[in-house]
């Protein structure tokens, strides 16, 4: 791939309009879905019951899931916790009072006894996540992304220029909105794990964008007499092989995680798979054209070209 992409001369800026229209369409679909059917919040945000148990021997998670499935506890997450003997069970169902909560815990323990063997199962911890806690986690998750965006805006403003910073932040907003829209359209469960993956996507996409922006800045010094559109095209083409090879190797690892990682890491890997693809696209077709659009001279030229195309 390095050989084939070493000296590419694609006109990315000349083809920016179809990419912009595609992005606007996908953002529109995402926003409509987010505002109409919203996100399918998991136990972390919607509330539920958390039960930590210990078996005397290492326990496979599949029998645990099968044992508690008939209890009708809503969305259920089962994962190892620390050691193979420790299992963490999170269920959507909440008790209206203490008696109902105890009934849920007792039902889970009774369901696990047949698979625990003669040594039985020991309850180590029980926590109840109410709706108020879920709302607090939602607020903190959104604030974490907002603070990340502000910090990125400040950093790139100092590192490059304000137009680069605005382009990077808008590209990141593009990535986050499309990823959240993906979860909303498919009604995939949205948990704290997905929020962590979203922040990882932001970091990955930003890294791709900064590599392109750094090359644009270097080309601006080297090609002082050239139009900005030509400079951006040259910079994107020079970084194209690095961008695609990095994304490809990352995707291969994520596919392995998605296929082999099990149910616990499934949503994390899925979020990153989608986010890395969108982030690679945005660093080439969104972040770079935004630098052109935010340049005063280029804006006037773009406006003139648009006027000439209009009959």
UniProtKB/Swiss-Prot annotation:
Domain of life (superkingdom): Bacteria
Record's keyword annotation contains Nucleotide-binding: no
Molecular-function GO terms, alphabetical: protein-transporting ATPase activity
GO BP, sorted A to Z: intracellular protein transmembrane transport; protein targeting; protein transport by the Sec complex
Pfam families (alphabetical): Sec_GG, SecD_SecF_C
UniProt entry keywords in alphabetical sequence: Cell inner membrane, Cell membrane, Membrane, Protein transport, Translocation, Transmembrane, Transmembrane helix, Transport
Membrane topology, from the record: Multi-pass membrane protein
Transmembrane segments: 19-39, 142-162, 166-186, 192-212, 245-265, 272-292
Coiled-coil regions listed: none
Any one of the GO CC terms: plasma membrane
InterPro entries the record matches: SecD/SecF_arch_bac, SecD/SecF_bac, SecD/SecF_CS, SecD_SecF_C, SecD_SecF_C_bact, SecF_bac
Primary location class: membrane
Localization of this protein: Cell inner membrane
Family membership: Belongs to the SecD/SecF family. SecF subfamily.
Known role: Part of the Sec protein translocase complex. Interacts with the SecYEG preprotein conducting channel. SecDF uses the proton motive force (PMF) to complete protein translocation after the ATP-dependent function of SecA.
Quaternary structure and interacting proteins, as annotated: Forms a complex with SecD. Part of the essential Sec protein translocation apparatus which comprises SecA, SecYEG and auxiliary proteins SecDF-YajC and YidC.
Protein name as catalogued: Protein translocase subunit SecF
Gene name as annotated: secF
